[in-house]
């Protein structure tokens, strides 16, 4: 697998597009321990993810086809799909699979690594450091991710964000568990997290 030659905003190597050009259920557990890095210095280690499998997944935004809201998910892999939910929160996904697949990985939690002062300023006063990025809406707020970042190229690193491999391998022998906050597809074990990490939004029971 070839690596991107674009300079990474965090020590390591930008994860190449080929990494994302696979099924979301393959990409998701391998995203664990990668770094979500911003050009302004904010960075966190990915410790919790969920996969959404497009037309095969009734919980996916893309299950019923392409709309203006979810169009980014049908585009090329290695881009952000950022959506607004509950009338108040942003969530970010990595688009996976070939063009038109409509699949992706929701980043659910980060372990903050750098730029904590900026993260604290972006979150409500008196937020504990443990809670800065513990949950999908919290992490987008802490990292400065919103609607303007929908479609950002995470591989080119020219749009302010990248996924970086700093050499830490994903956890071995991971078991998936049920996804959170969905009404359908709860039986699919497509949520993964770093075992024992205190920044995970909740335990991942096995199905």
Swiss-Prot record:
EC identifiers of the protein: 3.2.2.-
The keyword Hydrolase is assigned to this record: yes
Any one Gene Ontology BP term: base-excision repair
Molecular-function GO terms, alphabetical: alkylbase DNA N-glycosylase activity; DNA binding
Keyword vocabulary terms for this entry: DNA damage, DNA repair, Hydrolase
Keyword DNA damage belongs to the record: yes
Protein name: Putative 3-methyladenine DNA glycosylase
Entry-linked InterPro entries: Formyl_transferase-like_C_sf, MPG, MPG_sf
Family as reported in the entry's similarity comment: Belongs to the DNA glycosylase MPG family.
